[in-house]
Amino acid sequence: MNSKLKSIYLGQAIGDALGLATEFMSKEEITIHYPNGIKDYNDIYQDEHRSRWSKGSWTDDTDQFLCIDRSIKKYGHISTLDIAQEFKNWFNDNPMGIGKTTYEILKLPRKKIFHIRNLLIIY
């Protein structure tokens, strides 16, 4: 892997792990919990949501990035069908932190997901 590509992967994972610090917080909550900013993983406020992850762990955002990456490496181009299958495989492993909308779509049977996809393409 070349250094630029490696930097993209590291930036995604590190940024995601640090971004967990403010995920789902309002501006007011961020000001209260991080008056001096966030300098490292030890600064991350541990509430019910954030304490589910080990310090420095990435979230479902990076997991989904890696699903897309695997698909592109496999086919050499973007295949929405394969990316959907990668997401479904990832979902079947019961990932932590999955968003409500993503969860609601991925819990559907494969046939229904592709029906929705086809409707979106048509309209």
Locate the predicted segments by residue.
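Structured, active/binding-site neighborhoods that engage oxygen-rich ligands
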Residues: 1-123
